[in-house]
Amino acid sequence: GAPVCSPSRNVLMTGKHTGNCDVQDLKRVDAGENWRDLKGDWPIRTETYTLPEAMKKAGYATAVFGKWGIGDFGSTGAPDKHGVDRFYGYTDQKACHTYYPPYLWNDGKKEVLNTSLTAATIGHGSQPKGEVLADTYRAEQHSSDLIADKMLEFVKEKAHGKQPFFLYYAPLEPHVAMQPLQEWIDRYPREWDKSPYRGNRGYLPHPRPRAAYAGMISQMDHNVGRLLDTLKACGLDKNTIVIFTSDNGTTHDAGGV
C-alpha cells in the first residue's frame, strides 16, 4: 500500500509495488478547486492491467461500488476501460472527502445528489467562533447508504444467474470529513467529546469528533454486515471469498479522534 489513497488503490487494483505504479502521489488533472466539477486524479494508463480485467477475462461479471480514485470517466483510467462492468460511486479521491457530493457516477453518467454543500473544507482561517453544529455541514443526500444499496442490488441480481461475480466494495468511511448520519453519532456517550473540532487542522468542523469518527466506522460496519447478510440470504455465503482490508494508514488528526 501507500500512505495516501490513490497510490494505494493503484497497488490494490494492479498488484504492483508503488515504485512501479502509474499513480505515485495525489497529482491531479485539474487544480482541485471547483468541487462541483472535479476533473479527477491522475489516471492509470490504458495498458495498465487491473484485477477487474483479470477477473473479467476469467469469466466473472465485475463491479465496483464506492471509491475508485485512479481515473475519471473519459480518462485512460476510467473504470469501464479497465474491466469494470458495473460502477456506482466516486472516481475522484478529492470528491470522496465529502459524504454529500454534488453527484455520483452511475456507470458513465452523473447522478445528481446535492445542490447545497459540496466542499469538504471551510478554508484556512474560517473556523466557526460560536457553536459548532453538524447540520451546518450536511446536505440533502448522504452517499454511503446509496452506494451500499446499489451494491446489494448487484449481488441480488447476480445471485440468480450462472455467471460468477467479482465485487470490489470500497466505502469511504472512516475518511474525513466527519459526516456520519446522526443516528450513528447518537450511539456514543456525550462525555467522549470534551470540545468540538473547529476545522483548524483541515476538513469540516464537528461538535462531537470522537463520536462522529466512531459513528463512521459503525456505519461502514453496518453496510458490510448488510453485504454478508445478503450473501447468506442468497445462498452465496458458502461459495464466496470475502477479503476485508484497508487502503492506507491512520486517520487524519481531527479533534483528537
Summary of predicted features, one role per range:
Residues 1-257:
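Formylglycine-dependent sulfatase
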